[in-house]
Amino acid sequence: MKRGLTVAVAGAAILVAGLSGCSSNKSTTGSGETTTAAGTTASPGAASGPKVVIDGKDQNVTGSVVCTTAAGNVNIAIGGAATGIAAVLTDGNPPEVKSVGLGNVNGVTLGYTSGTGQGNASATKDGSHYKITGTATGVDMANPMSPVNKSFEIEVTSS
């Protein structure tokens, strides 16, 4: 169980680093891949900006929202490299959540990866609006033998 949790957290951390490093405000189309960037900044109550809630607490996420569709997946990256949040969904309707990386929250790197038996996630799609909810897992380095589970909710619109 500990190995699966470690693999899930490491995979989520790599996903966040990789996707947030690709954030730009360019929109390209070619070879079956589509990238869309929405230059939005989140503010409390902003309907068009990304909304991220972890463990019942609204996260102040700022930066671009980048959505890339390739090989049957939708890759969503929110924010910059330091505060990046990422998700990979299938492009179906409803989409299936493959992974979510929430970054470091109060000293705990949180993530979800399907098939690991750790946490859970589901998603809905309404046009270009996505809502992803679930429970992410992580390891608190102050107590590494006790896994941490936190609920999360992500709402984002790809333009």
Curated annotation (Swiss-Prot):
InterPro entries for this protein: LpqH
Membrane topology value: Lipid-anchor
Post-translational modification: Modified by Lgt on Cys-22 with an S-linked diacylglycerol with a mixture of C16, C18 and C19 fatty acids, signal peptide is removed by LspA, modifed by Lnt with an amide-linked mixture of C16 and C19 fatty acids.
GO CC annotations, alphabetized: plasma membrane
UniProt region (Disordered), positions on chain: 24-51
Lipid addition sites, S-diacylglycerol cysteine: 22
Main localization, broad class: membrane
Claim: Cell membrane is one of the keywords in the record: yes
Highest taxon listed in the record's lineage: Bacteria
Low complexity bias spans: 27-49
Signal peptide: 1-21
Lipid group attachment sites (N-palmitoyl cysteine): 22
Keyword Transport attributed: yes
Swiss-Prot/TrEMBL keywords: Cell membrane, Lipoprotein, Membrane, Palmitate, Signal, Transport, Virulence
Localization per record: Cell membrane
Similarity comment: family membership: Belongs to the mycobacterial 19 kDa antigen family.
Domain notes from UniProt: Forms a U-shaped beta-half-barrel with a large hydrophobic cavity.
Biological role stated in the UniProt entry: Might be involved in ligand transport. A host TLR2 agonist, modifies host gene expression in response to pathogen.
Protein name listed in UniProt: Lipoprotein LpqH
Organism of provenance: Mycobacterium tuberculosis (strain CDC 1551 / Oshkosh)
